[in-house]
């Protein structure tokens, strides 16, 4: 099975099989946390405006712009906040700067799209392995069009675990991700050095970083199940 890692989304990229979308700080971590808290479904939209179109008393709007909760949204993009949110049985509509856009890029061609993070790394890798017939691709969201150490490190963790599950043929991007993972024995160190973590520190949200650095704490894997309007519908596997 081919194992591929793309460090940022690209218009030219196509995916024939399974894609693990990674935005570890913070969207894909927060997505798993919302499912842990009992959310029925996650609607991932490509923009804040398209998220607001779903605003309703039965819907929870969550997202960020510049790391902070946007106006008229109920919640930000904090996984700590998501885990304790009153979302059981409800739809959570999410829009973020990088993660939701990466998911839409993957969904253009992939057979299966999963949201992965360190938080659900082992469960996400196992499911990807079960679903794949020829390739598992890991798509890093990056930060505003640039590669992110945090996502690349997470891709390395996923790639390593996929290798434990069975034989893989890593392409160059996967080898780079594996090398990054091996360079940082401590997940928190790798994440803390990233531009995404430094941006959170600037807005006083650095407490989210240790949460995002937890490895394999959740079995909740958001899987793409459909669409409504511009939104991708993710549900727990």
From Swiss-Prot:
Cofactor: Mg(2+)
InterPro entries: ComB-like, ComB-like_sf
Pfam family, one: 2-ph_phosp
GO molecular function, one term: magnesium ion binding
Enzyme's top EC category: hydrolase
Protein EC: 3.1.3.71
SUPFAM superfamilies: ComB-like
Domain of life: Bacteria
Signal peptide range: none
Keywords: Hydrolase, Magnesium
Catalytic activity line of the entry: (2R)-O-phospho-3-sulfolactate + H2O = (2R)-3-sulfolactate + phosphate
Membership in a protein family: Belongs to the ComB family.
Name by which UniProt lists this protein: Probable 2-phosphosulfolactate phosphatase
Organism: Thermus thermophilus (strain ATCC BAA-163 / DSM 7039 / HB27)
Gene name of the encoded protein: comB
């Amino acid at each position: 099975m081919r194992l591929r890692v793309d460090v940022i989304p690209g218009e030219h990229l196509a995916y024939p099989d399974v894609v693990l979308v990674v935005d570890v700080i913070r969207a894909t971590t927060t997505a798993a946390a919302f499912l842990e808290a009992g959310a029925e479904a996650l609607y991932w939209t490509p923009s804040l405006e398209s998220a607001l179109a779903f605003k309703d008393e039965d819907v929870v709007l969550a997202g960020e712009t510049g790391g902070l909760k946007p106006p008229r949204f109920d919640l930000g993009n904090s996984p700590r906040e998501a885990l304790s949110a009153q979302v059981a049985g409800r739809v959570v509509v999410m829009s973020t700067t990088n993660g939701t856009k990466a998911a839409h890029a993957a969904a253009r061609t992939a057979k299966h799209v999963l949201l992965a993070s360190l938080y659900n790394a082992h469960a996400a890798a196992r499911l990807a392995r079960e679903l794949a017939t020829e390739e598992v691709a890991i798509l890093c969201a990056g930060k505003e069009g640039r590669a992110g150490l945090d996502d690349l490190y997470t891709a390395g963790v996923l790639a390593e675990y996929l290798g434990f599950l069975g034989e893989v043929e890593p392409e160059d991007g996967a080898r780079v991700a594996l090398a990054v993972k091996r360079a940082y024995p401590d997940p928190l160190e790798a994440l803390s050095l990233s531009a995404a973590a430094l941006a959170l520190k600037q807005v006083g949200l650095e407490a989210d970083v240790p949460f995002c650095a937890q490895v394999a704490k959740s079995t909740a894997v958001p899987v793409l199940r459909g669409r409504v309007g511009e939104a991708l519908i993710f549900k727990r596997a």
